């Protein structure tokens, strides 16, 4: 299935009880552009930890302006006490609130992002949450993303131009390829949003 077909299926089967999670990375540049063409009123949600990069906030504004959307916010702010507490207590709890009442959610995960995502399918049942999970970009490469971003002149996160392949919270993210810049110096590669 193409990205458009996967999103159309998600919208046809689950809208308006469908949520797209948005972290304003290159994957979401493509997904938001495609999704609003199919369902301009789709619910797009971000998780604000209170320690996002200033560039993330700028990209957020650029998305809203370019795509004519209002991104809903789930607040995950609180005292930053390190990646384990922040990720599990704050981000995962915020995602659960964002998905309350939803039948399905859309993510930007791609197989080439790492071992924990290598077996992802375009459409899968999220056993942990009891809802469907759509991963329209699962087969896309980094090159595919950049080709689309440049073809359509889409807004994208400026930290990608400075060597950040994956962008999360400022205290836990360094430049690096794949997900190696996330929680650098630890074995952690996922915050818990996409892990059962």
Place the predicted regions along the sequence by residue.
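Nucleotide-activated chemistry modules centered on ATP-dependent adenylation/adenylyltransferase
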Residues: 1-196
